[in-house]
Amino acid sequence: MGIRKYKGTTNGRRNMNGYDFAEITKTTPEKSLLAPLKHTAGRNNAGKMTVRHRGGGTKRQYRIIDFKRIKDDVPATVKAIEYDPNRTANIALLGYADGTKSYILAPKGLKVGMTVQSGPDADIKVGNTLPLKNIPVGTVIHNIELKPGKGGQLTRSAGTSAQLLGKEEKYVLVRLSSGEVRMILAACRATIGSIGNDEHGLLVKGKAGRSRYAGQRPHVRGSVMNPNDHPHGGGEGKAPVGLPSPLSPWGKKTVGKKTRSHKARSNKFIVRGRKRGPHTR
């Protein structure tokens, strides 16, 4: 979708922009593919906060997305491109030849009226899903499985894509959008093309209220808290951290501290790590 810039009539709208929704062809979702979505405000079943800065937000319904694409050799026609409030990517409504309907992530270039298919013998074209072993080297892919039959887990957000770099017996090499090169089982499936809505990264909220609509509450800096609330708190005026390294609210090292386990089983499948910023090297 394109980006629409608003006139600066108020301070909140001065730099604000939003989607123009030019690609959206249907505004009401398919009722049979909806599920209730309860907001928990970051609390668990005991009512205790497990994730900070969450709460409120607009009510929304979950769109049931087909990440598995296991309906093989049955062609489906793209009936509509819809907005999904639960993710950054748009979704496409498919109507299969046998009468069933489903939602998929809308790849870039997918239009209403186009036909998509899944299965080992599907053509190499945008929107088709195949096992990785059947996809040519160099192809751009998205919605990649990590376990056969589990459904796509990688490369699902707006504008992202991965590339198939090579094949080895049971595994294939895939370069993810982070720059990481990873070995994935060749029996896992992926969808051809890159995710659409690639201008999402240019979105400017412009005011705090748009974060509140999304269920995001204010993120208060530790340096403006009291010493009993945060390790960075206290002091006269704008005091520095006063510690060898920044700490989390619970006293753990943060900013550049690696949190991934050195014993993780999946470490052996990472051929090359992701690109890192200067503060994490």
Curated annotation (Swiss-Prot):
Gene Ontology CC terms, in alphabetical order: large ribosomal subunit
Composition bias, Basic residues: 254-281
Family annotation (SMART domains): Ribosomal_L2, Ribosomal_L2_C
GO biological process, one term: cytoplasmic translation
UniProt-annotated stretches for the region Disordered: 208-281
Pfam families in alphabetical order: Ribosomal_L2 (PF00181), Ribosomal_L2_C (PF03947)
InterPro entries: NA-bd_OB-fold, Rib_uL2_dom2, Ribosomal_uL2, Ribosomal_uL2_bac/org-type, Ribosomal_uL2_C, Ribosomal_uL2_CS, Ribosomal_uL2_dom3, Ribosomal_uL2_RNA-bd_dom
Ribosomal protein listed as a keyword: yes
Swiss-Prot/TrEMBL keywords: Ribonucleoprotein, Ribosomal protein, RNA-binding, rRNA-binding
Gene3D superfamilies: 2.30.30.30, Nucleic acid-binding proteins (2.40.50.140), Ribosomal protein L2, domain 3 (4.10.950.10)
GO MF, any single term: transferase activity
The protein's assembly and partners: Part of the 50S ribosomal subunit. Forms a bridge to the 30S subunit in the 70S ribosome.
Function: One of the primary rRNA binding proteins. Required for association of the 30S and 50S subunits to form the 70S ribosome, for tRNA binding and peptide bond formation. It has been suggested to have peptidyltransferase activity; this is somewhat controversial. Makes several contacts with the 16S rRNA in the 70S ribosome.
HAMAP family linked to this entry: Ribosomal_uL2_B (MF_01320_B)
Family recorded in the similarity comment: Belongs to the universal ribosomal protein uL2 family.
Name the UniProt record assigns to this protein: Large ribosomal subunit protein uL2
Organism annotation: Limosilactobacillus fermentum (strain NBRC 3956 / LMG 18251) (Lactobacillus fermentum)
Gene that encodes the chain: rplB
